C-alpha cells in the first residue's frame, strides 16, 4: 500500500502552489505535481491491501473515522474497468459470507471466509456487452442480475455453486431470462418471493413484477406504467403506523423522467394483476429522485436525490418523509451533511443509516433520534481521498447487512473495499 505521507505531501504541495501568484509558478511545476498525484492514485487502484486500522483519521491514505480497512481488492484483480452495484450472500450451510461485486463486464464473486484475505472466485460475464450499470439482488441462494447493456435481460445464478471453490473461474448463468432487454435496477421482497425490475424497456420503465419462488423458472406476472420511469424501489409487507395498509405488499418507488417529473410513488402491489396507486408526491428542489429506504418501523422514508447537489449547489442532502399517513406523506427533515458530495445509495439497519456517498465514500449516521429530527454522523470511510466534491467518482454502493459487521463498498475506480467498525 502507498504510504499516506507521500500522498499528503504531494497534495499539500499541489494546493500550496495553486494558491501562489500565477506569475511565480511555472506551469511545468504544476504539471509535475499533478502527474505525481496521479501516479499515487494509480498505485492505489492496482494494489491489494490487507487490514489497516483507522488511526489519527486515516487507514493508509484513506480518510476515516470509526472504521478500519479489512481488505481492498482493486479492479485489476477482476480485470475490469469499473465497478458499480454490489450485494452480499451468506451460505446458510457453511456460514461463509460472499460479496457479489458488480462490474462493467460482469459480476465477481468474492469469498470472505478469511475476511482479511478475501478470495476472488471468478466472474459471471455480462450477458451481452459491457455496461457501467449493473444491479444485483439475492433470494433463496440465487443471485438476480440486470444491466443497462442491450438485450441483457435477467441473469439467475445459483450461489451454492460457489461452495468449496478456491480458484478463479468463468461462470455461466443458470437461467437467462430474455423477456426484457435493458433494466436499471432490481429489487426483491424476500417475504413474498417477487422480484421487481425497474427502469426496463417494459411498462414505460415502471416496475415489472416477476415471480421467483421457483428460482429457475422466473415468470413475469404484471407491471405498472402510470407514474413514469422508476429508477429504484423498495418493496415490503407493510407493518407501519397506517392501519389501512397493515399486511399489504407495498412498493416505494423513486421515479424520475430526468426532467420535471421527480416524485416518490407508493403502490399497493398485493394483487399483481391490479396494482393500486396509494399516493405520488414530489418535493422542493427536486432534480433526480434516485433511491430511498424505509426505517424498520416503516414510519420514515429516507430519500436521496442524485442531482440536487449539482443543480442547486447544496451540501449533500437527505430528505426524510413521515409516512404515518401513507396517503399524505409529510417532509419531516431535510438533512444537510458536512460534505458537498452526491448521495447515491442508502440503506437502514436498526438505528443506523449507511450511505454510499460517491466521492466521500461510506457515511454512517445514527438515526435513533429521528423522531426528534436529529441525525448524527458517527463514522465514515472515504474510498476516494482526492476530494469530497459533487462528482460521479468513488463509492457507488455499499452492502451493510452481513452479520459479521463487515461492510462491502464498491468504488467505481478502485474496486472492492471491506471495512468494519473499529472496536471500542
Language-model features: where?
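Bacterial N-terminal signal peptides that target proteins for export
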Residues: 1-7
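Feature marking well-ordered beta-strand scaffolds used for ligand recognition
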Residues: 23-424
